[in-house]
């Protein structure tokens, strides 16, 4: 299979974290797959990267293949294991209102050699915690759009929407502005482009609590709500227990949407694939084929990698 940029793609990398009560879970983990449905852990299931700055934890792991070569990994700067008692009084409202206004980041040319960790100062002083950064490369303007969920002081940190900022180098960033907002609270935005259409997946926290899909011919919208997608999501058992969307094209050309399910015992939590017959067709259905993970992957990103990259990762992290 070839991507739109012509890269021969024969495998997949899934970056993610683990939901554990110990701090080693909230770090950066790698897994790989040849078919996009059955993943195997790398590095013996131990972290690839460990945060030593900010909150000393990484959640909501994002990875981007840079158009100039190499990759950047960006994460939410948050450790529930380290900080929930000390900083947040076991209160998620405190997390939302007083959490980090930076993102953790590492740069790498080859997914093996990494730069020193950085804290990216993207946020504003009036932001609460900045959740789930994701990056979209705007080819027309040759810049990266970073989007994430945050509350703000002006509404007493009660209404999360999707903000965005643009950068060309992940060193300087434009002033954050709203990217997508609704009357209800939303989070976990995932943005992809197929053909000439932009597809935005996100999670409604309420009214109703479930994953949504919207689409537009323009990167900055307006986005049209996909009622058929909402109708199908509403038929799932515990529709509000899915979050953290990430999507990619399978080797046979079908479109895979991964959703992180947390509506069960912790040992069984993790991603579930939903499959559409063709890219751009949002008629997703829960996967009936075999899929497997060595443990429950939590909020992460799947990217396409070459067979050479796959072999190199397997050899280095064996």
Predicted regions and their residues:
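Carbohydrate-active catalytic/glycan-binding domains of CAZyme proteins
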Residues: 1-318
